[in-house]
Amino acid sequence: MSGVKKFIPLLDRILVEKISNQATKTSGGIFIPTNKDAPTNNAKVIAVGTGSVKLDGSFIDPIVKEGDIVLINPKARSNTVPWGDKTYHLLSENDILGIIEN
């Protein structure tokens, strides 16, 4: 996808970039390392489609927005999208389990 400036997913599709596992800090200030090679289910939303279509033809707006940090279903089937020097994943909004707020 070299030369592409913007990618707009169709319908309920969401383009995400998975976030690598990092050490977590306890309330006491101790860092607990995580296995950086373990698969991560956290991702940043890069682009959002227009939403789902109801049976009557009207749209259901997407719940997530660009920039959200989300938890993805570990069994989600996604398409890998190489773009520039990064790899993104295209999945259905139904595969997002929740939005992570800090």
Curated annotation (Swiss-Prot):
Subunit structure, interactors included: Homohexamer.
Domain of life: Eukaryota
UniProt-recorded Gene Ontology molecular function terms: ATP binding; metal ion binding; protein folding chaperone; protein-folding chaperone binding; unfolded protein binding
Protein purpose: Eukaryotic CPN10 homolog which is essential for mitochondrial protein biogenesis, together with CPN60. Binds to CPN60 in the presence of Mg-ATP and suppresses the ATPase activity of the latter.
Principal location listed in the UniProt entry: mitochondrion
Record has DNA damage as a keyword: no
Gene responsible for this protein: hspe1
Protein name, UniProt field: 10 kDa heat shock protein, mitochondrial
Record bears the keyword Mitochondrion: yes
Subcellular location per the Swiss-Prot or TrEMBL entry: Mitochondrion matrix
One GO biological process term: protein folding
Keywords: Chaperone, Mitochondrion
InterPro entries found in the cross-reference section: Chaperonin_GroES (IPR020818), Chaperonin_GroES_sf (IPR037124), GroES-like_sf (IPR011032)
GO cellular component: mitochondrial matrix; mitochondrion
Family statement: Belongs to the GroES chaperonin family.
